């Protein structure tokens, strides 16, 4: 896995909070956000933001946001009633890795990033949510191309 360290600008987005095991909570969350964004004609990049470490937090307590990047700061009128909020992914220094997910196994690239690639980079996590940016839609095939992002600081 190749990791690059980049300074990213803050990214505005529409987000929907989900809680529970990631494999069970993210899909329904994305379906809700996709239906809502389609009703409003919104387009952007799809992301998932992760707030908890699954090695430290019980599966039922894991928090994540499913998100759609946006260029606007205006939340459509039914956003709050739908559980959707306007938010910003903080800018700053991130470790980024482009990975391929096979058979919907999203955990393996994250483990490789945190256990091997990130320590070898000379950087360490700096708090704040990690993210997945979806570069392809693998719903039908189970094969995804995505970018993993972790806020970092020099070790």
From Swiss-Prot:
Any one GO cellular component localisation term in the record: cytoplasm
Listed SUPFAM superfamilies: Probable bacterial effector-binding domain
Family matches, as SMART domains: AraC_E_bind
Domain of life of the native organism: Bacteria
Xref: InterPro entries: AraC_E-bd, DNA_gyrase_inhibitor, DNA_gyrase_inhibitor_GyrI, GyrI-like, Reg_factor_effector_dom_sf
Family to which the UniProt record says this protein belongs: Belongs to the DNA gyrase inhibitor family.
Full protein name: DNA gyrase inhibitor
Annotated source species: Edwardsiella piscicida
